[in-house]
Amino acid sequence: VVNSTADLIAKSLVTTDFSGPVIRYRLLDTTRAYALNKLAASGEAMLVAARHASWFRDLLTRENAEAQGQGEAATSMDQIDNVRAALEWSFAQSDRELATSLASAAAPLFLRLSLLSECYRWMELAIAALDHRWQGTHREMELQASLGVSLMFTKGNRESVRTAFGRSLTIAEAIGNLDRQVQLLSLLNIFYLRLGDYRTAFVHAVRANSAAQQCGDHALIAATNGLIGSNLNLLGRNAEALQRLTDALRYEGGEGRKSGIHLGYNYRGHARISLALTLWFTGFADQAVRVAAQTVEEAAATRHPTGLCLALLYAASVLMWARDYGRAEHHIEAFIEHAHRHSLKPYIASGLGMKAEIALFRGHAQDGVNTLRRSLEALRQDQYSMRIAIFSTSLAEGLRSLGQFDEAVETIDAEMRRAERFGDLVAMPEMLRVKGEILASMPGTEHHQAEAVLLQSLELAQSQSALSLELRAAMSLARERSCNGTAQDYVRMLASVYGRFTEGFGTPDMRSARRMLDAVGLG
């Protein structure tokens, strides 16, 4: 074989590729066509195609076993056409054994490369082709899990996603595969987070952590601690979240497996995103922006499209909370382009909603309101609820700008009821603050009504350790009282809140607070 290959290279019938870690040889198109004709004439084409499919099935199976828990494998984009050809041939021949085993082995490759639409196609075909011998086995477990991931990211949070994850988890529990139990419980956590049901999501995060403890794998324990931290942030338990996330991210590897990408989900990236948001809420705006930027850099380095998309989305979220709309817009544009390129349909509406928020900030109230309505409709259709509270709050602010006060109050009240029901509490102080400001602007509303709601916002922010939202509520209270000449107490309260910050003094909120304090000699 070596001599034959060398002879073909010498005759320029084969090209050599030295760009990767392994030297690769490729027949020229004319040579390939000639060889295929000879193969067909010999009657051995079917035999060679079967060997080709089996060889890639075995290669992928071996690499998946070697990379188990490491989030990496050697086979990559340069071999994807071979894998596709093998799958096409296997299913065309109705060779159920080869087709389903190859699809199961290829699933991690499709997920690693974020070829989600393709992954969905092959997993659906393979599950339909499973016979009774493979139902309830490791093979079906892998196929169902990968089907759920590809469905969730391309089609939204349908019941079929929950069914696929649930079936895979049932098999993992039946065969005693703790690693897969951790990963599937983590994916069910993400599924419920995306639905906006944060209380049910938290239950699954705790279950994932319990399964990781049973594994005794330090990396999985750290990863699921990060998952719990992310959930605590969304539940408004920011101090606990900050501790969990900080501890989880201290783990850098060593004994056990890396807390990297499994079944298309990047534990570490998700924890860093959540840490950035939690840092902002707890009053560490400068650190939040730095961590968000680092998360985007890390995600770009992994070359994992779904992970980069999430990093861009949440880095933009941090910048939006910090009112740094210029830099946020740059991330949003990159996020939308990335989501389109990789068919991540449920994310596109989030990007459009964030662009609408920037339009509101720039004074384009009607355009912003119209786009937010479309974004919210699309998000609800895809059952992607993680940004509904924030967008509904912005919609209410836009309606207030247009003088549509009754609809603004109805919008914010409806969203607060939903958020309370499902535990979407991290933005509740901001929703209360915006409602208070709407009431303060609303003709015929007594000042004490607005003040009572703003006080609720302040007290809830305090209970959540959300210092940044506490500052906003204190500023709104001071402004409201200044309208009727009784702002002194609330200005002193604002000074007290301002004095607890140790960084972020250049942010718009902090500059506004400083100007208010300077105006009364308390700066």
Features from the language model and the residues they span:
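Inter-repeat boundary and helix-capping residues of tandem alpha-helical solenoids
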Residues: 45-49, 72, 76-79, 92, ...
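Short, well-ordered secondary-structure microsegments
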Residues: 63, 71-133, 141-151, 182-184, ...
